[in-house]
Amino acid sequence: MTDKNPQMERISQVFGADEIPRVAGKTLHIYFEYLKERLDCPCLLTGIESIRFFGWEERFEFGYGSQAEYERLRRQEGSYKDKYELKEFDATVDEEWDILVKVQRIPYRKRFEIPLSQLQAVDKSSGNYQLLNDYTVWYVNWR
């Protein structure tokens, strides 16, 4: 095995291989099972940035639209700035998209199904933070 940084080592170990495989249906299922066994739930999550699922927010970040419109859409759509509770790892593997997790927004209690690669654990010192960060790094860089 070549010298890898610790994160690359952890990702390789998910698949039991020297080389990190590309994101595909089979590898998404492998990662899903890995996370299902290791994530501690409930877990408090938040979005990473205003792209993909949270892409509606991008224009507001650049100064377009009113604050009232932003707040209205935020209640309806969910924001990457919101906090979400993952009560259990109730997820679906969408081979074309991502691992989709069912979360409940705090405080409004609205439920969403959000791509896991768009979320991170709020507690950066937790094992969940590392697990989810490793998944996102793999998902973004091996697609």
Question: Language-model features: where?
Answer:
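Basic/aromatic-rich interaction segments and small domains that mediate binding to polyanionic partners
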Residues: 1-54, 61-131, 142
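Intrinsically disordered, low-complexity terminal/linker regions enriched in Pro/Ser/Gly
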Residues: 136-140
